[in-house]
Amino acid sequence: MKIQFIVCGWWYDEWDGKKNQTEFIDALYELKEENDNLDVMWTCHKTPPKIITEKFDYKEYENIGLEWGAYDKVLNDMDLDDNTFLFFIQDDMVVHDWSFINVCIDHFNLNPTTKVIGNGWNYPWDINPLEEARLSYWLKNGYNWRDYAKEENKHLYEEPLQCWSMRGSFFASKMKYIREVGGFDYVNFPLIEMPDGSDSRDPNGNTSEYLNGYKFTKVFGQQGMKYLSDQYRFSKYMTECGAGS
């Protein structure tokens, strides 16, 4: 059994203005060192510090697509077996109990209809992929949801659907399931400045999040998507800080 963590690197050991916040990094390194079947790859949107480069495999990419782009790009550069268990996680996650690893693996093994597991419940949304997407409300560019998808995945975005969704902060799956949906779709251009002076992190991220939620629901069905808790951004295993990357 092979376990692969894919960590979206942005905050590293500095969080909320405080440096040397290494609890997440230290725990992940300990897991890697103590388990021969567990590997960790950091997919970074800015140059990682030595605490990452000296302990983990990593790749650095331009910050396009936020966490969804980071996950997709690094998977394209890796050669993973179909049966590899995948754990996608942002480095601002507060982990209370690492036993979620075995909980997810046991659930996949006992419930073959389950294809992806998120942390806390996330909001469903009725989406018509041929209508204007969330990001386009801000940009006024008129793009529909399907316009943001990869060319090879556009055929999946055809009809109105109530989609369930997974936040990019954390979700687990298997490599064969991610290949089944053609990897991850995401807004494929950099963050821009919005009229109020902020950047487009939220509309970019929300559009990418629900693009993938639509696709997961379309291919796997709602029965294929599970959560570790029924609370938004929280389970007994993890709390999502929601800061983005």
Which residues does each PLM region occupy?
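Short beta-strand-to-loop acidic/aromatic patch adjacent to the donor-nucleotide binding site
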Residues: 83-96
